[in-house]
Design a protein with these regions (language model features):
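Residue-level "edge-of-site" marker
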Residues: 195, 210, 243, 259
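Long, low-complexity intrinsically disordered regions
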Residues: 179, 193-198, 202-208
Length: 285
């Protein structure tokens, strides 16, 4: 039996979708057993083009991979499992995109996945059929762009102003201070907590910890120094760094350096390669 192989391709959205979609991607797996960690992440919209499996969330909940699956923001790593070859096309969603898709219902799907047919019915299956027929990633992106333009049902009421301030706060400091965010937004601590829980899946302090850990994980996986970016001062000591990175990626710094999760490494490589075409929150985490 040959060695199992994972390939992940990424592409940035065009200007029409840049405020809603973080990146497009396709994952292809050749093998008969897939069990890979996915770190805590933003919401996802995924088309299962080949194969099927399960998502195992950190709290023990298990969800099947539907033909088209919507996954809410995750606050901790989950494990994707399958016993067959896979091909998955999808896109990540900025927090404004998640709000534009789900409206006030988004908070119910933090660390959860559900069948996109619940919202979009047979239409989304026709999109899936087009993606399967297209085969080439570039052609699938064109189809995906057209589909994505039609899924954001609540775009008019999406909190673009608020999420842009939160994203800038997260990207602008290696250890973001919640008081700074309160000052920028003009919101009370209670209002901030309610808004970030609704749109990001967690309160602001934990959100800052999540992206601090993911940025550190990206550097560690590539053998870079945390001290060169200021992240070295963002953790109390080595044990604090290990705990935080493992909480949000499922892996220790040593495991990241060793490339023990092939999917995690492929994801980090793909996002980093997008560079300036996407937000630093994407390319640096």
């Amino acid at each position: 039996m040959g060695r199992a192989m994972i390939e992940v391709m990424y592409e940035a959205p065009d200007d029409r979708l840049a405020e809603l979609v973080s990146s497009f991607y396709r994952l292809d797996f050749i093998g008969d057993r897939f069990a890979e960690l996915e770190r805590a992440d933003r919401a996802q919209f995924r088309f299962q083009l080949e194969g099927s499996g399960e998502y195992h969330f950190a709290d023990g909940h298990v969800s099947p991979t539907y033909p088209v699956t919507i996954i809410g923001p995750t606050s901790a790593p989950m494990t994707a499992k399958a016993d067959c070859a896979l091909s998955v096309f999808g896109w990540g969603m900025h927090s404004a995109g998640w709000a534009a898709l789900m409206g006030d219902e988004g908070a119910a799907y933090i660390d959860r996945a559900f069948d996109a047919r619940q919202i979009f019915g047979d239409w989304i299956m026709r999109v899936r059929n087009e993606l399967i027929a297209a085969a080439e990633f570039a052609d699938q992106i064109e189809i995906g762009c057209l589909a994505a333009e039609n899924i954001f049902r609540f775009k008019a009421s999406a909190p673009f102003k608020f999420t842009s301030k939160v994203d800038a706060w997260l990207a602008g400091d290696s250890d973001p201070d919640v008081d700074v965010l309160a000052g920028v937004t003009g919101l009370s601590q209670r209002q901030l907590e309610r808004m970030t829980k609704r749109h990001y899946g967690m309160p602001p302090k934990k959100l800052a910890r999540k992206y601090r850990a993911l940025r550190a994980a990206q550097l560690l996986a590539h053998g870079d120094s945390l001290d060169d970016t200021g992240l070295g001062l963002a953790f109390y000591d080595q044990s604090h760094l290990i705990r935080e990175v493992k909480q949000f990626t499922g892996l220790t710094p040593g495991q990241l350096r060793a490339g023990e999760s092939e999917l995690t490494r492929a994801t980090m490589d793909g996002r980093r390669a997008l560079g300036s075409k996407v937000s630093r929150l994407i390319s640096e985490s």
